[in-house]
UniProtKB/Swiss-Prot annotation:
Coiled coil: none annotated. Its main location: nucleus. SUPFAM superfamilies: GTP cyclohydrolase I feedback regulatory protein, GFRP (SSF69761). It comes from Bos taurus. This is GTP cyclohydrolase 1 feedback regulatory protein. GO terms for cellular component: cytoplasm; cytosol; nuclear membrane; nucleus. GO terms for biological process: negative regulation of biosynthetic process. It comes from the Eukaryota. Keywords: Cytoplasm, Membrane, Nucleus. The gene is GCHFR.
């Protein structure tokens, strides 16, 4: 799985940061210290960490991921990363 999306609600100085969904690499989610949750009303699960995005991006960079793009959608910030 070379692509990864992470997101956070505005304020990006604090967590939580969403780092994956139910199809994400379990080993990578464990490395990030992510917990799996299901939000009431959603029919899917997501992995999140309490770290701010900067900490998550630093951890992912050390694992070989690079940011391809970043955007804001409403009050959500999203980063797309890729690993060669």
């Amino acid at each position: 799985m070379p692509y990864l999306l992470i997101s956070t609600q505005i304020r990006m100085e604090v967590g939580p940061t969403v780092v994956g969904d139910e199809h994400s690499d379990p080993e990578l989610m464990q490395h990030l210290g992510a917990s799996k949750r299901s939000v009431l009303g959603n029919n899917f699960s997501e992995y999140y960490v309490n770290d701010p995005p900067r900490i998550v991006l630093d951890k992912l960079e050390r694992r070989g991921f690079r940011v391809l793009s970043m955007t804001g959608v409403g009050q959500t910030l999203v980063w797309c990363l890729h690993k060669e």
